[in-house]
From Swiss-Prot:
The lineage of its organism: Bacteria, Pseudomonadati, Thermodesulfobacteriota, Desulfuromonadia, Desulfuromonadales. It catalyses: [protein]-L-isoaspartate + S-adenosyl-L-methionine = [protein]-L-isoaspartate alpha-methyl ester + S-adenosyl-L-homocysteine. One of its GO terms (molecular function) is protein-L-isoaspartate (D-aspartate) O-methyltransferase activity. This is Protein-L-isoaspartate O-methyltransferase 2. Its main location: cytoplasm. The gene is pcm2.
Length: 225
């Protein structure tokens, strides 16, 4: 379904219009159906999470560079991973890899609280300031090794990892509630992975399924690369 611009629609340079095109073509057009995810993607201004010089590209469906040699994921992947978490409004979510803070902002529109861990100090500081200035008050950002999770606030209903790991970090598995979901890119290559969803069925019972092929920057840390 293509978004139809009304007669009084602003020009194509208008970011709200571009956001609607993103929703209809990149997300709904590729199978994203969760109303809460679509609403969150509509509410969060991606252009506020990229450098000034990149804002014209904010709603293109590809990653964009941010500080520290990292990237902000393409909108479809953010929506896909968020939908794969099967979230509810009461959930507490752990995000590994804050980056610019965009995905945390999207999550914050759906769930009760988001805890986000970023290993790079400049990114953690920038994301924290950006999220606070934009009013995302249910997000907490911590600078640290994301492969170890954030045990002080565990357990979590859902965990999402935004970098590729050689294997699922055991500390993250232990920080899931029973019934919780973990979505993470995993692969033998540091730049080519399969997106995996792990469900904690019981105290020591975890079931995993492959969702799709993805390409993420490496997950660096004690339990990563």
């Amino acid at each position: 379904m293509r978004y139809r611009c009304p007669m009084n629609c602003p020009s194509l340079r208008n970011q709200e219009y571009r956001r609607e095109i993103m929703i209809s073509e990149q997300l709904m057009g590729r199978g994203i159906r969760d109303p809460a995810v679509l609403a969150a993607m509509r509410q969060v201004p991606r252009e506020a999470f990229v450098d000034q010089g990149m804002r014209e590209l904010a709603y293109e469906d590809h990653p964009l560079p941010i500080d520290g040699g990292q990237t902000i994921s393409q909108p479809y992947i953010v929506a896909y991973m968020t939908e794969a978490l099967e979230l509810s409004s009461s959930d507490r979510v752990l995000e590994i890899g804050t980056g610019s803070g965009y995905a945390a902002a999207v999550l914050s529109r759906i769930v009760h609280t988001v805890y986000s861990v970023e290993r790079l100090e400049e990114l953690a500081r920038g994301a924290r300031q950006r999220l606070e200035s934009l009013g995302y008050n249910n997000v907490e950002v911590f600078e640290g090794d994301g492969t170890l999770g954030w045990p002080e606030h565990a357990p979590y209903d859902a965990i999402v990892v935004t970098a590729g790991a050689p294997a699922v970090p055991k500390p993250l598995l232990r920080q899931l509630v029973v019934g919780g979901r973990l979505v993470i890119p995993v692969g033998a290559s540091s730049f080519l992975q399969n997106l995996i969803r792990v469900r904690r069925q019981g105290e020591d019972d975890y079931r995993s399924e492959e969702l799709c092929g993805v390409r993420f920057v490496p997950l660096v840390g004690a339990e990563g690369w």
